[in-house]
A protein has these predicted regions:
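Class I S-adenosyl-L-methionine
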Residues: 2-182
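Generic N-terminal helix/loop capping motif
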Residues: 1, 5, 25, 233-236, ...
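C-terminal target-recognition/interaction regions appended to catalytic cores
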Residues: 135-276
Length: 276
């Protein structure tokens, strides 16, 4: 639909009209407040036609609406993930939350304490191998007694051989041209950088060729638990189902720490209304 990946079909893509179905539920349920999240392209695709249609429909339903782009890294999430948000209320125009931190958490902060697995290693349930090495890791562990979903993809040998050619924190520029394949995006075969937030976690984070979602130095893509940490799901979240469903649960989610910041902002706005 609106994503930077794949074709941008705009008005010719039926997925871009799913907002109408969502707003039909709003019309039926009449919540006091609701939030819409989507990729930032929803604001600009087809010269802003979809953005304007969404706002017009929300207003017609009797809601105030404020919208803008928020980056998860500004809210304590160790990931640079920009998304468009529409915050809608029957009572007043809601402000978007302000950033909660100017010091961005990093990949190292998020996953350095997790077992260093090779391709195909790990289990759905395992034990921690070290004490937490950062405040974020302590926060992630909460009171979890075990580690769940820390199981590495079993890559084909050709993928492992390619990753062995890529130095720590580097990318496909180190691969011979005859091994690049058909991937067009610059980020394919990329490794995460320890001391930076990760790029956006998507629903194919366990594929070595997908993007910059390979371990900083190990020859594999990140595990579901590592991806969950980078999304700010704490270790008590257990992801169930087939691999494809687990990837979608993690990669399609609004990071919990960002969701909390939005919820806190809405709560503050309603406290002001009650005081008035």
């Amino acid at each position: 639909g609106f994503s930077n990946k794949g074709k941008k079909l705009g008005l010719d893509d039926s997925r871009n009209f799913l907002f109408r179905e969502f707003l039909e539920f709003v019309e039926c349920l009449e919540p006091e407040v609701f939030v819409i999240e989507n990729v930032r392209g929803i604001l600009t695709t087809s010269n802003g036609w979809f953005r304007d249609q969404i706002i017009h429909k929300i207003n017609d339903l009797g809601y105030y609406v404020n919208y803008g782009i928020l980056n998860s890294r500004d809210f304590g999430v160790p990931q640079s993930r920009e998304r468009a948000f529409f915050i809608c209320s029957k009572s007043k125009m809601m402000r978007l939350p302000k950033e909660t931190t100017s010091k961005h958490r990093t990949v190292r902060d998020a996953i350095e304490d997790l077992a260093y697995l090779n391709s195909g290693e790990g289990d759905e349930i395992s034990n921690y191998v070290t004490e937490p090495l950062s405040s974020y890791q302590r926060y992630m562990r909460k009171d979890s007694k075990h580690l769940f979903n820390h199981k590495a993809s079993n890559h084909k040998q050709i993928a492992i051989e390619k990753l062995k050619m890529i130095p720590p924190e580097k990318g496909k520029e180190y691969l011979p041209k005859d091994m690049l394949g058909k991937q067009l995006f610059k980020s394919t075969w990329g490794r995460l950088k320890w001391d930076e937030p990760s790029p956006t976690i998507d629903t194919r984070f366990d594929a070595a060729s997908n993007g910059t979602n390979n371990h900083p130095f190990l020859h594999r893509a990140i595990t579901p638990r590592e991806a969950a940490r980078l999304q700010s799901f704490d270790d008590r979240f257990i992801f169930l189902g087939a691999k494809v469903h687990i990837r979608k649960q993690i990669g399609n989610a609004v990071p919990p720490l960002l969701a909390k910041a939005i919820a806190d902002q809405i709560s503050k706005e309603y406290l002001v209304i009650e005081e008035e």
